[in-house]
Amino acid sequence: MIIGMLRAHMITSLSPIPTMPSVNINKPKARFLYAI
């Protein structure tokens, strides 16, 4: 669970600027799934 969150964080930090908005929109969903 924690590893998944770290991977998601790394992906968001490494992703190009154009794709950032879409990733940020998906962030809450990922956090919700990891929380479960």
Curated annotation (Swiss-Prot):
Species name: Escherichia coli (strain K12)
Protein name: Protein YibY
Miscellaneous comment: Encoded antisense to waaL; it is entirely within the waaL coding region.
Upregulating conditions: Expressed at low levels in exponential phase in rich medium (at protein level).
Pfam families xrefs: YibY (PF23515)
Source taxonomy: Bacteria, Pseudomonadati, Pseudomonadota, Gammaproteobacteria, Enterobacterales
